[in-house]
């Protein structure tokens, strides 16, 4: 030790020294610190050999980064420590262990050489031995903080604090504490580069406070973890002891009893072979797993789903056609085709048994016609359970097929969930609003439904959650839609389309009388105070308070009347027992609708067209105005692309037939034609207004009026041929309601007349046409066709004299 003090004194006496440099990786050496260093680089070995051949003094300097070029002195810090090499030991792996002791801080003055080792000129930094009351106070604070750190730390030895407590020199105390703290290289180097002891102690106080906060938080976390581990171990030991006690007493523990009950349920559930094997396999995993394991609840939930699903339980089908027919007749008015189809299915099941595949019906019709309620009646007629799944707004394929069990919170798809609610394997399953399905990046649910609705595949439906084939073939699927256009073609191909058209006025009156009024009287507590609504009042409600093809809003209006009566009864006021048309304003307010009526006079340029929407049929007056201009055509009324093209075709037909119609062909270049379809706020589209547009344009050009009691529908070609259209039944009913008695329809639509009720057909005249030459004599008050050429059915032209057209009789069909 005397030699060491003498060496330090000699070093301190010199202003600068030239010494070899040992770069340190991920280490900062402090004065008085003794530490082993492991050296492998040739540059470092050369520096050590040079020091050993001299006075064993070497400058230990930390590298700024772990990976640097060996001779790159710019990556070395400028402040280091002179170290005395105590021992050098070569190891079997080729590295060298060097034991060094730090002595004094030095500042690098100049880098003298980098070959064969780094040599530098250094200036010794004299240690700061200043002593004051402030330094004494800081030493005490640092020691107190250091004591806390040593107590909280799991890695620092207890004698580290004892060693620090025995130091009286402030600089030595600061260096000792800094060398033992678990700091990164940057913070260690910052402490090394603080030459004034007061500043070093102040910085060390901050570092110790931060370290105390970290250690206390770590200690808190460790305690929490240990408590949980101890509790789990305690619970485990208690359960094991309880199990042993119960075994000694001949009792069964609850967990074992629960697992045994699960096993018995699996055996008794009459599962298919694959499902039973899967259930027993999962039960085996459950038995090997502690209840606290996260997977335990996942497997248990999966087994509950397997056991609660109906795998073989069925409802006995009704085998009496008369009973089924009576149920359908009591619950629904009309709908003859639908009822016949259901009775046919029951008859086939009676003859063929379970071998016949259940049909997949698609009820298509406007809102409120009874599609959903008809599904319930079908289930009642068949004696089966009824379940319903709404598909409106479903965008994710997983809604149909479910999620795999690898996902947190995974559940079966809505098909399997609904089957669990059904409780039997052969319910009537209604997929409501199938035309409202969507798709996005999560998949296409319509594609998943292809398997559900395919009788050849749905006996092995694959739900991702179950991961087992599930038999859907015994289900009678019924889908509902307002429109067929949005439904994917492959999906539509799997379904049998059953159209539910809108009700006519007389049907609505009968439905209200038989179903809606009794239902609302009971719902509003008027069974002891019954009321009646006259047929005239019902018709007035239908015509002016509702605008629909079904009866949903009609039921709301009847309910509104019943509620007003219920209030008067509750207030013990007088109320009418029979509702007449004159009372409707008092009960329902002013009527919001007014069905279109036929024009009260024959007009030029105004043709009556027959239209159809989801709310039913109606008539619309298409207007054409001719003004001086430059040959432009204007179309207004929010017309769609197809209807605009139809208007252009009608205009081209009129121009091509101008000579036959007595129109000056040059006139088209001097006029502007404006075609308008009223109710501009309502979008309109479709080709069926072609002949109506043509008649309106021809009337305006020839200045001949059109008959107000004639309505028409049909697509037009450039040669004047009339092509078939859709929605004829609703269009005829709408025109009939508007007071039209003569209707022009395409000849190819004659087959659709069977759908028109007989009582309506008897009161109207329907004229079937194939060409505009047949339309014009009936649509106009005076035939615009003059003596001249006329198109034949094959498109050729021939000179004819038109005969006088006699007006057809009511109830007739002109071919």
UniProtKB/Swiss-Prot annotation:
Pfam families: AAA, Lon_C, Lon_lid, LON_substr_bdg. GO terms for cellular component: cytoplasm. Homohexamer. Organized in a ring with a central cavity. GO terms for molecular function: ATP binding; ATP hydrolysis activity; ATP-dependent peptidase activity; sequence-specific DNA binding; serine-type endopeptidase activity. The keyword ATP-binding applies. ATP-dependent serine protease that mediates the selective degradation of mutant and abnormal proteins as well as certain short-lived regulatory proteins. Required for cellular homeostasis and for survival from DNA damage and developmental changes induced by stress. Degrades polypeptides processively to yield small peptide fragments that are 5 to 10 amino acids long. Binds to DNA in a double-stranded, site-specific manner. Its EC number is 3.4.21.53. It catalyses: Hydrolysis of proteins in presence of ATP. Residues 19-212 form the Lon N-terminal domain. The active site is at residues 688, 731. It comes from the Bacteria. The keyword Metal-binding does not apply. Belongs to the peptidase S16 family. Keywords: ATP-binding, Cytoplasm, Hydrolase, Nucleotide-binding, Protease, Serine protease, Stress response. Residues 601-782 form the Lon proteolytic domain. It comes from Herpetosiphon aurantiacus (strain ATCC 23779 / DSM 785 / 114-95). GO terms for biological process: cellular response to heat; protein quality control for misfolded or incompletely synthesized proteins. It is found in: Cytoplasm. Induction: By heat shock. This is Lon protease 2.
């Amino acid at each position: 030790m005397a030699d060491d003090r003498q060496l330090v004194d000699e070093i301190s006496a010199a202003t600068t020294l030239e010494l070899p440099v040992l770069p340190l990786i991920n280490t900062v050496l402090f004065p008085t610190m003794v530490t082993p260093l492991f050296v492998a680089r040739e540059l470092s070995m050369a520096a050590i050999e040079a020091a050993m051949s001299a006075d064993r003094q070497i400058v230990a300097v930390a590298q700024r980064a772990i990976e640097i070029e060996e001779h790159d002195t710019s990556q070395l810090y400028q402040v280091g420590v002179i170290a005395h090499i105590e021992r050098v030991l070569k190891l079997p792996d080729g590295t060298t262990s060097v034991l060094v002791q730090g002595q004094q801080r030095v500042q690098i003055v100049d880098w003298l050489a980098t070959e064969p080792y780094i040599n530098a000129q250094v200036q010794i930094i004299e240690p700061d031995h200043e002593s004051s009351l402030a330094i004494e106070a800081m030493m005490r604070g640092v020691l107190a903080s250091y004591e806390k750190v040593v107590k909280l730390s799991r890695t620092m030895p207890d004698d580290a604090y004892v060693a620090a407590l025995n130091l009286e020199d402030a600089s030595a105390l600061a260096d000792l504490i800094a060398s033992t703290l678990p700091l990164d290289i940057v913070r260690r180097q910052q402490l090394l580069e603080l030459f004034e002891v007061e500043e070093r102690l102040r910085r060390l106080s901050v570092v110790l406070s931060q370290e105390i906060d970290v250690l206390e938080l770590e200690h808190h976390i460790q305690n929490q973890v240990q408590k949980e581990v101890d509790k789990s171990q305690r619970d485990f030991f208690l359960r094991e002891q309880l199990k042993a006690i119960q075994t000694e007493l001949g009792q069964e523990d609850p967990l074992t009893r629960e697992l045994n009950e699960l096993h018995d349920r699996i055996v008794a559930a009459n599962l298919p072979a694959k499902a039973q094997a899967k259930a027993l396999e999962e039960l085996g995993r459950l038995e090997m797993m502690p209840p606290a394991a996260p997977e335990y609840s996942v497997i248990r939930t999966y087994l509950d789903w397997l056991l609660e699903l109906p795998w073989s339980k069925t409802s006995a089908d009704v085998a009496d056609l008369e009973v089924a027919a009576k149920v359908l007749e009591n619950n629904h008015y009309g709908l003859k085709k639908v009822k016949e189809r259901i009775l046919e299915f029951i008859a086939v099941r009676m003859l063929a048994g379970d071998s016949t595949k259940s049909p997949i019906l698609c009820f298509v019709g406007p809102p409120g016609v009874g599609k959903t309620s008809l599904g319930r009646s079908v289930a009642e007629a068949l004696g089966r359970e009824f379940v319903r799944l709404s598909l409106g707004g479903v965008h994710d394929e997983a809604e149909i097929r479910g999620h795999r069990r690898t996902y947190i919170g995974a559940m079966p798809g809505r098909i399997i969930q609904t089957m669990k609610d059904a409780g039997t394997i052969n319910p009537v399953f209604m997929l409501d609003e199938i035309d409202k399905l969507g798709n996005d990046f999560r998949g296409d649910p319509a594609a998943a439904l292809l398997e559900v609705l395919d009788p050849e595949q749905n006996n092995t439906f694959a739900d991702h959650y179950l991961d087992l084939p599930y038999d859907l073939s015994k289900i009678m699927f019924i889908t509902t839609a307002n429109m067929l256009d949005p439904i994917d073609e492959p999906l539509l191909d799997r379904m049998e389309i059953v159209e539910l058209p809108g009700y006519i006025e007389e049907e609505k009156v009968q439905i209200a009388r038989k179903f809606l009024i009794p239902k609302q009287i009971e719902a509003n507590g008027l069974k002891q105070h019954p009321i009646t609504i006259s047929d005239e009042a019902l018709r007035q409600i239908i015509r002016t308070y509702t605008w629909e093809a079904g009866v949903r809003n009609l039921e709301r209006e009847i309910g509104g009347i019943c509620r007003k009566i219920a209030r008067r009864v509750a207030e013990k006021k007088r109320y009418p027992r029979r509702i007449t048309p004159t009372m409707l304003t008092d009960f329902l307010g002013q009527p919001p609708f007014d069905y279109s009526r036929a024009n009260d006079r024959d007009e030029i340029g105004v043709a009556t067209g027959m239209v159809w929407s989801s709310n039913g049929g109606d008539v619309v007056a298409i207007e054409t105005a001719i003004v001086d201009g430059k040959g432009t055509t204007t179309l207004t009324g929010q017309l769609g692309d197809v209807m605009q093209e139809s208007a252009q075709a009608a205009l081209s037909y009129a121009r091509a037939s101008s000579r036959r119609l007595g129109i000056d062909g040059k006139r088209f270049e001097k006029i502007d034609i404006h075609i308008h379809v009223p109710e501009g706020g309502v979008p309109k589209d479709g080709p069926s207004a072609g002949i109506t547009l043509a008649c309106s344009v021809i009337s305006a050009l020839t200045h001949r009026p059109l008959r107000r009691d004639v309505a028409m529908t049909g697509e037009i070609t450039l040669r004047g041929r009339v092509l078939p259209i859709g929605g004829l039944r609703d269009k005829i009913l709408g025109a009939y309601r508007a007071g039209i008695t003569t209707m022009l329809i395409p000849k190819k639509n004659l087959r659709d007349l069977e759908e028109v009720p007989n009582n309506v057909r008897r009161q109207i005249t329907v004229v079937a046409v194939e060409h505009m030459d047949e339309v014009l004599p009936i649509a106009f008050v005076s035939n615009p066709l003059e003596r001249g050429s006329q198109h034949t059915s094959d498109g050729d032209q021939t000179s004819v004299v038109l005969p006088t057209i006699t007006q057809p009789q009511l109830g007739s069909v002109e071919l």
